Structure formats: C-alpha cells, structure tokens
C-alpha cells in the first residue's frame, strides 16, 4: 500500500484502488536516499483538470497514471506554493513531492513589478525541497517547471540555512535537475543562488567571527577559486592613511579591530584597458552606534551592517564564475563602529578624501562616513558606472520595509537597467528621490562643508543619499539602501528566517545583462 498523508475517508478510497507496489520488495528494491520534486499548475478554468508539467506528466505515465489518481483523492487541488508528499510510487524515487506552481500563464505582473511565474516556481520548489530535507533524504531531483534557472534558485536558496556553529545540523541536500534538458539554465540558477547564499553567510556570521580581516580573507578565497582573472588587495590601515581617507578612519578608530580597505578586481574583458564597472559596499562588521550608542534590543542584528559589502562582493564572485566578458572593481571599507576613548564624538569635524569637511553630529550615521571616502576612490578607475550598496538607514526600512531595495540615482538609464534586472530576479527595487531639497539639508552646516545627519529627522533615507551625492561626480551612479531587505522573517517564502543576502541576484542579473549588451 502507499503511505499517504490523507484523511481517513481518502485512505479508504486508496484501498479501493487496489494499487500494487511497482517493484519487487527486497534489499535492493529502492534507493531511499533520493527524492523527486514535480510541479503541477492551477486550473485555468473551473471545469479544467490541473495540468502537470512535462516532467510531471512523464512521471505520471511511468507509474501508469497512479500519481494522478492518488493526487486527485488526496485533497483539493494544490494552490501555488503548497505541497503534497507521496511514498512508494517508483523504486528510483521512493519519496515524491508534488508542488503547486500557480497558473501556467502567469507572467510579468506590472503592479507587483516581478515575474509572477518565476516567483511561483522559486517558492514552490523551495517548499518541495524542504519537504525532502525534513525527511533527511540527502539527494533530490527537481522538475525544471518550465524555467530551470528559477527552479534552481528556489532549490538552492530554499535549502540554505546558516548552522555553521551548531553541533546538530540539518541534513545537507544535494539538488540536481530532473532530466538532461536545460542544464545551462539550471547551472546559471545555481550560481545566482549560491552568490546570494555567500552573502547570507557573510551577514549571518557573528561579529566576533566575521572581523574586517576575516571578511576580506573569505572574499579573497572565494574570488580566487572562482576565476584566475582576479586580483585581491587587502589594504591595511597605513594605506588608508596614505590615501587620506579621514572620514573612514574616524569611524574605525573607536575599535581595537584594525580597519581594512578591500579592493577586488575581476578582469573578464578581452580588452584589459576597458574601463570597469565599480561596485562599492558598506562594510561595518559590527555597528554599536559608537558614542551615539544604539538601544540594546536587536543590536545583535548589527553584525549584518556589512550587508552592502557582502552583496557586492558576492555578486562579483558570481560574475567571475559566470566568466562574464567585462571588468569589475569591488571596493569595501571594512571596520567596526564602537564606543571608546578614541571614538568619534558628536560635533567632531573630519576631512574626507576629496577635501570636504564633515560635521559628525551623530556617530551612528557612520556608514555614509566610510562610503564617502570609498566613493571618492572609486572615481580613480575611470568607471563606466558606480553602484554602491549599504544597510544605510532605518528610515529606508520604515519607507519600503522588505518589499524592495530603495535606489537613489542620478541616471535614468541606470535606474531602468536595475529595474529590469529586478523584475527578472523577483528581488525588487524602487526609485527614490535625489532632490536638491535634501541636499540643502546636509550642506546647511555650522562647522563644516556637510553635516552627516542633516537638519531634520524627516526623510532620513533621502538626506543620507544626498550626503553621499556630495562625494560623487560621475554621471552614472546609483546608491542602493538595503536596510529594509537586510533580514527575512517570512516575507520571501524561498528564504528561511535570517539574513537575506538581498539584492545579490539583482546585482548579478544587472552584470549579466550589461555584459550581453556590451558584447
């Protein structure tokens, strides 16, 4: 008999089917170490029967229609993201999870600003793979569900959980494509998702483990193993001083951990002299707030205040693995923001690399201080584009929550490229204003050229972006405030609770499309 998760009435119905085992019993009968995830679509019309995917239909034929029979009596039709698990259907796959994919016709939703079909696949496959993981089965084959890249992303993202420091860990499940078609798209999805998982790991690791130096070493290890077309420079404090990065150093001086300026190069273009794209990421490996100290509640989350550095570095590692034919430079000023006798004090004035002076009225607005020097340095590479990412402001979380990354940019062309990439990945972005209205609030300063918090509490994300703009002269620059998407509670179904690693896949997709446009 089949072992089904059914109510009593349905179990009676199954017995009436007189279903027999499809293979001979015995020690060699079934490989209990492999599961299968198959997709089924919702009905387009009420009178229709739900359709399996191609892979689901083929498997149903392989078991003489039994999958359809038991699915029909096991409960109502599966809604998007829901699962049902069956056992004993085929000796190659003793455990089969059927997942609901929603409507087959689902496409780009202009109201939601994403591809609904791809998001449904990611969520459904993640749910199915977790069912296999809960059964402690170490291998799963996944139906491409009509989009092998989205299926791979759902599997790899959905199975990931940070448990590096625990003695008891979840079973590691290896996911691979069911069938031989679409292998290229599947592998691309694995790379995209693995990039986001790298960012999640960097962000989740406790701050005593993930120091500025350790962060740089992990990125170096991952980048060097990704491609031989790479260079990594872990710049010490003496180099930072030589570069006259006084704004960065003012934040770092409060901690016993030495600051590091991480500079990574991926040289994928056949033309070595081709100008690069430059990514800059905020790298505060722990943010106490400094002298303007934060409240104790949830301060532990500030181990992920280097999320900007984590996402941009992970995106570049992924670009290297994809062997994209472009040049990219990644810059990450790395330090802690701690209170001490050496720390910044409210009212201090510091000097940035471009000579501008900054009045530090709040030491908890430190991310913009380290980014100011990094953005100045970014211009030395004659870049095609400058994009920075930072968990910069709580105001961004209040404005957009976890729904989208806020993007402030001086280039509509760049905005459109990021927006298009985000529709594909489902990791959305939303354009925010860079009005002169906000610039006036940060340059109206009593003691220096600019103030690090501005005149008013209102529009904190906008005034922070206006502050950064004071250190940018490039006509194609975008600032991504990722504070609202730093963590995941239950908003993204294919990510477990914890640090989200967003918007890594959107940055990878942006680079992927840019490389195709440049070819």
Swiss-Prot record:
Catalytic residues of the enzyme: 294, 368
Positions bearing Phosphoserine: 42, 54, 180, 194, 238
Keywords in alphabetical order: Acetylation, Aminopeptidase, Cobalt, Cytoplasm, Dipeptidase, Hydrolase, Magnesium, Manganese, Metal-binding, Phosphoprotein, Protease, Zinc
Description of how activity is regulated: Zofenoprilat inhibits Cys-Gly hydrolysis activity.
Top-level EC class: hydrolase
Pfam families membership: Peptidase_M17, Peptidase_M17_N
Binding site for Mg(2+): 287, 364, 366
Catalytic activity entry: Release of an N-terminal amino acid, Xaa-|-Yaa-, in which Xaa is preferably Leu, but may be other amino acids including Pro although not Arg or Lys, and Yaa may be Pro. Amino acid amides and methyl esters are also readily hydrolyzed, but rates on arylamides are exceedingly low; an S-substituted L-cysteinylglycine + H2O = an S-substituted L-cysteine + glycine; L-cysteinylglycine + H2O = L-cysteine + glycine; S-benzyl-L-cysteinylglycine + H2O = S-benzyl-L-cysteine + glycine
N6-acetyllysine modification, residue list: 455, 489
Annotated positions of the N6-succinyllysine modification: 45, 61, 103, 455, 476, 489
Residues bound to Zn(2+) 2: 282, 287, 305, 366
Family of the protein in this entry: Belongs to the peptidase M17 family.
Free-text function comment from the UniProt entry: Cytosolic metallopeptidase that catalyzes the removal of unsubstituted N-terminal hydrophobic amino acids from various peptides. The presence of Zn(2+) ions is essential for the peptidase activity, and the association with other cofactors can modulate the substrate spectificity of the enzyme. For instance, in the presence of Mn(2+), it displays a specific Cys-Gly hydrolyzing activity of Cys-Gly-S-conjugates. Involved in the metabolism of glutathione and in the degradation of glutathione S-conjugates, which may play a role in the control of the cell redox status.
Protein name: Cytosol aminopeptidase
Taxonomic source organism: Bos taurus (Bovine)
